[in-house]
Amino acid sequence: MIYVPIFAWLWGKMGKKQPSSSKKFAYGLLAAGLSFLWMMLPGMLFGTDVKVSPFWLIMSWSIVIVGEMLISPIGLSVTTKLAPKSFQAQMMSIWFLSNAAAQAINAQIVKFYTSETEVAYYGIVGGITIVFSIILFFYVPRIEKLMSGIK
């Protein structure tokens, strides 16, 4: 909730200069990936068998929330704008089902996490997420063209 007024102010201040919806998605994925890489650092610096400051977790949450603010509200908005009027409710359902599917995939991936694999787990998940964000950045012009001017 802390970030909502900040982003509302930022988008208002930027006006027409703000990034497109697809770029916001790519930046959101990048932030999510960076939050995983951030969580890798304490294990690399101090080892996985010691307690570290909660600062690491708070900072990771802060980074991933920035990503969430760039994906979730934008995704909801774009879904309603792109959906045909008679199918808006169904498309919103598909948006939420895609989130559920992602959580189901994550439930399988998280099984690879142990204290022995902690650093590698966060590094691999963060790295893959960042690769997907880079791929999305490359596709932004094509996506914007397909969106036919919908911001």
Model-identified regions with their sequence ranges:
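C-terminal ends and interior cores of transmembrane alpha-helices
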Residues: Y27-D49
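A gly/Pro-rich, aromatic-decorated transmembrane alpha-helix motif that marks the paired
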Residues: M40, A100-Y113, G127, F138
